[in-house]
């Protein structure tokens, strides 16, 4: 006796339509970006936020990159300029030590006309008397920008000394400055995304007035 077919022609047609619909489904905006980020270990430090970050990037794409990935920390330039560099590095301590960095002895030396950080007793200028004159003259805000650039440079020197692949990049929303830690591979992925906004791409801050390294196009 022959066994009856387990699937009727109608059922087979329905299954075929479902499969065809699935294969033609429109990918989410961030699918390709998410795949590249996964390959470059973007979520390595995200901890319990990793799945939420993945979902947001898949749904929104590039704009969702700057969430709670464990790579982003506040870095207000004005706070840094007012003697906040040592506290800033201390805030980054868990991340830096995770990269193998040995934090040196740091001490703020904030004076009326200058600010330096003593790194194991050696003076690292954050802003000088001449910088203050520029601040009070035609370049308001320059001490904050210089403090950020020189603080980031200090952090990157520590990372380089520890042989870490991560580097401190600045991200600026127009209202606040933050530091975002990225590898060369990750910054390349971010720059190559077709919907990337050039002036919001993370950048290495410089001491060059007036944009201090921030892309403008």
Could you tell me what each predicted segment is?
Residues 22-23:
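C-terminal motif of bacterial Sec signal peptides marking the signal peptidase cleavage site
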Residues 26-217:
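Contiguous interface-forming segments/domains that mediate binding rather than catalysis
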Residues 2-13:
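Bacterial N-terminal signal peptides that target proteins for export
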């Amino acid at each position: 006796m022959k066994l009856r077919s387990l699937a009727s022609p109608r059922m087979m047609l329905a299954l075929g339509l479902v499969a065809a619909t699935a294969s033609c489904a429109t990918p989410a905006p961030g699918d390709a970006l998410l795949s590249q980020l996964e390959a470059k270990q973007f979520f390595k430090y995200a901890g319990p936020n990793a799945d939420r970050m993945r979902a947001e990037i898949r749904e929104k794409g590039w704009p969702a990159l700057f969430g709670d990935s464990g790579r982003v920390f506040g870095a207000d330039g004005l706070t840094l300029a007012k003697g906040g560099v040592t506290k800033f590095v201390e805030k980054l301590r868990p991340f830096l030590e995770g990269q193998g960095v040995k934090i040196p002895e740091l001490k703020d030396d904030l004076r009326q006309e200058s600010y330096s950080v003593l790194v194991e007793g050696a003076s690292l200028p954050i802003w000088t008397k001449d910088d203050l004159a520029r601040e009070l003259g035609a370049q308001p805000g320059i001490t904050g920008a210089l403090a950020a650039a020189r603080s980031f440079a200090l952090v990157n020197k520590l990372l380089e000394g520890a042989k870490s692949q991560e580097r401190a990049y600045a991200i600026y929303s127009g209202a606040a400055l933050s530091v975002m830690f990225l590898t060369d591979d990750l910054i390349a992925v971010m720059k190559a995304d077709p919907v990337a906004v050039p002036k919001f791409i993370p950048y290495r801050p410089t001491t060059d007035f007036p944009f201090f390294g921030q892309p403008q196009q």
